Structures are given as C-alpha cells and as structure tokens.
C-alpha cells in the first residue's frame, strides 16, 4: 500500500524541538510500504521538520538556544512579529525524506526525526507520504 497519513500534535513552547520519530514510524507501519522512502512534511510556514541528533538531550537545548539567537537583530517588515519564525522555517525546511527498508526507518544510530516549532504553542499537522520502490 502507498498513500499518506497525517498526525497532529500540540506544541507547548514558543520555540521547541520535538522528537517525532516514533510517530513517523507508526505512520510508516500504517502505510504498509516495505521499501522506499517517507516524505515527512508540514503544511505550516512557522515550523520545520528535519533529521538530527536524537540521543543526547543537550543537543536539543543547544539547538533551541542557537535558533533563538540566530536572527535577533534583524529588522523585519512583517507586522505580526513572527518573521523570524518564517525565516527559520524556510532555512531549515518543511519537509525531509527518510529511507525505509523492510518497513523500518533507516536512520543513523543517533538520528531521529524532529518537528521544530518556531511560533508556538500551536497544533501542528505532520503529513507522511510513502514513496515506494518498484520491485
């Protein structure tokens, strides 16, 4: 089977790095694709998704601090005040590919899939689409 699955989550902070590896793996199981890749994407302009370090919790706090400091002195014209979130979303990206083999995510030993909230707290939708390999 191929297709797509969507799951939702509620972020709790303005800037938050959330490990969604388990939810993406569950989506892969629902999709029933043994080999190929998953396109993990967000229909949002103030959040991002990426693959990164999942083992050491200090990396999450380091990344959150670095993102908060990345654009503090830049003057933005957008009146809502969330232009830094839009910029960071575009810089990080709103989609990533995760290889699948034998129905399992193919990630490095320390890797995980992360949603990066940049303008929370909010409810976020994560779309997972199967891209299967032809046999």
Task: Enumerate the language-model features and the residues they cover.
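Active-site histidine-anchored catalytic micro-motif
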Residues: 1-135
């Amino acid at each position: 089977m191929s297709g797509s699955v969507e799951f939702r989550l509620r972020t709790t902070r303005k800037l938050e790095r959330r490990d969604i590896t388990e939810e993406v793996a569950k989506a892969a199981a629902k999709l029933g694709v043994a080999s190929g890749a998953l396109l993990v994407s967000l229909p949002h302009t103030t959040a991002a998704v990426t693959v990164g370090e999942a083992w050491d919790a200090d990396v999450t706090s380091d990344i959150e601090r670095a993102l908060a400091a990345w654009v503090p002195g830049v003057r933005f014209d957008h009146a809502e005040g969330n232009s830094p979130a839009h910029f960071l979303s575009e810089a990080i990206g709103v989609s990533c590919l995760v290889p699948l083999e034998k129905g399992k995510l193919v990630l490095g030993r320390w890797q995980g899939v992360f949603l990066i909230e940049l303008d929370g707290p909010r409810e976020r939708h994560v779309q997972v689409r199967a891209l299967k390999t032809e046999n």
